[in-house]
Amino acid sequence: MPARADVRLAPRQRLTRGLKYTAVGPVDITRGVLGIGADTAQATAAELRRRYASGKLQRQLAAAAEAVAALPETIQEAVQEVVSPPKKRRRRPLLIAAVAVTVLGGGAAAFSIVRRRSRPQEPPTLAPSVEVAPKP
């Protein structure tokens, strides 16, 4: 009896046929055992995926329940922040402004001193209106 290639057999049917016929038996037995092993592995993987999804769902439900349990405390904290916001200290901007004023003041003083020293002292071109040495 020739084996028909167009018929798709399930792994169990293939194993049964392989045990029944001796001509194509070893090939069908091997393919049947491998097919059963593959089906088992696929079923195991599907079960593991289902368990993982179920565990993930349980973890998500537990996290949601915890969030709902903490909701009154969170609302109370939010209301307190809105009613009386915490006072923040503004030390850094004041410090930066003070340093900027000091640097500008120091720069102005240095500019003034350097400018005075760089100008030569020329005698005035007009005669003095008052005599420098009084007569006795």
UniProtKB/Swiss-Prot annotation:
Signal peptide stretch: none
Location of the protein in the cell: Cell membrane
Bilayer topology term: Single-pass membrane protein
GO cellular component terms attached to this protein's record: plasma membrane
Pfam families attached to this UniProt entry: CwsA
Main localisation: membrane
Keyword vocabulary terms for this entry: Cell cycle, Cell division, Cell membrane, Cell shape, Membrane, Transmembrane, Transmembrane helix
InterPro entries for this protein: CwsA
Name listed for the protein in its UniProt record: Cell wall synthesis protein CwsA
Provenance organism: Mycolicibacterium smegmatis (strain ATCC 700084 / mc(2)155) (Mycobacterium smegmatis)
Gene name linked to the record: cwsA
